[in-house]
Amino acid sequence: MEDNEFDELIDDWFIESLKTYRDLYVYQLEFPTRVIEWTSGKTICVTGYNKSSKNEILELSLPQKLFAEEKKGLCAERDFKVLHGGFSPDPVGVLKHIPGTRLIVTNDELTSDLQVWNLGGDDSDIITKVSSVQGSAGSPGGVKMAARISPQPEVLHGSRGGDVRLTQLTTGQTLYQLASTCEERLTSLHFVSNAVFLAACANGDILTVDTRTSSPPQLAPAPSTPDSDMWWTDVSGRGGLIRVSSSGWAAVSDPRSPASIARQARLAAGAPHREPHHVNVLWAPALDDIVAVSGFSGAVQIYDTSSWQSEPRDSHPLFEHRGHAVCSQRGEGGAVAVNCLLWHPKETRTLVSAAVDASLHVWDWIHRSDAR
């Protein structure tokens, strides 16, 4: 693409963004990140993924202007700010913040071992490693994790359906070991209560596990759809489970009965990126029936699932964030993949997204009905 054409494309998109975003902040990291994780309502953690060098772990504060209720024009802080930082000798492909603490847990996606880090506090700006957790013997890399508020910090982790365990981080003690022969790779883990969690498999199966019993997990098979080689899953605190397949099929269930499909659709998402870890499917925590999907193109798509029915029909996005795709046109003549995505836990329509070109965007989108 010629420079003049690229400049016109950027100008057109920014003019359009004045009508479609309440807020939009564009930031360039020094390194691409595969993870974004909230450490508070105004701070995120990002990390590098370079197999041949040390990788930064950074805690960033979001622009204060984003959270200014009134007179945003008078708010001086309009940029991201590094609060704490450290280095990992290994790439970081998975990261989980432990709620109620200053601890994060990381995995390099090469082994199943975990590294535990302290993010620091007011008296120190250094992120330091405090301990390690050895993974299951023979377990592959690419650990998935889930965390919950508990008296002692703990994390649920595993790579396959048969090697999931709950570990207390202060002692390294295994609090629970899943009794299952399932060898399917996991795409995510989700607590649905203090005692029950769901293990989502790459083939679309869902394992429901009650940690209070030694009974084997309940298996809910994948939806029956054509050409769906891989599935990604999310569970909403508002009571919905969604599975999206590599062919663009989406199915919504009640987490208490994941085998029963309540409604489904065919998404206008296109083909997924060649790297499965780039795909993200996330319910909006502060909105009913709204889900964000990324990794199928250079855009983040927002869908309203409330209109979906028991029989699948084509569904078109309510909103698309094309900022990463537009801004990447100069580099390689094509869009880059969005490889991580996060909704704000309380701000209704605010998301953070990052792409493989190291771009980091924070954006608050406007619903079409609000723009009239």
Segments (PLM) and residue ranges:
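Beta-propeller domains
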Residues: 1-27, 37, 41-85, 107-134, ...
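Elongated alpha-helical scaffolds
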Residues: 89-109
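Per-blade loop-tip surfaces of WD-repeat and WD-like beta-propellers in eukaryotic adaptors/scaffolds
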Residues: 63-74, 113-131, 152, 159-186, ...
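Structural hallmark of WD40 beta-propellers
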Residues: 42-46, 101-106, 150-157, 194-199, ...
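Loop/turn-rich, solvent-exposed surfaces of beta-rich toroidal or solenoidal domains
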Residues: 274-312
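Canonical WD40 repeat/beta-propeller blade segments in eukaryotic WD-repeat proteins
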Residues: 31-38, 90-97, 136-149, 181-192, ...
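Amphipathic alpha-helical protein-protein interaction segments
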Residues: 22-29, 50, 81-88, 157, ...
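Blade-level signature of beta-propeller repeat domains, shared across WD40, Kelch, NHL, RCC1
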Residues: 338-372
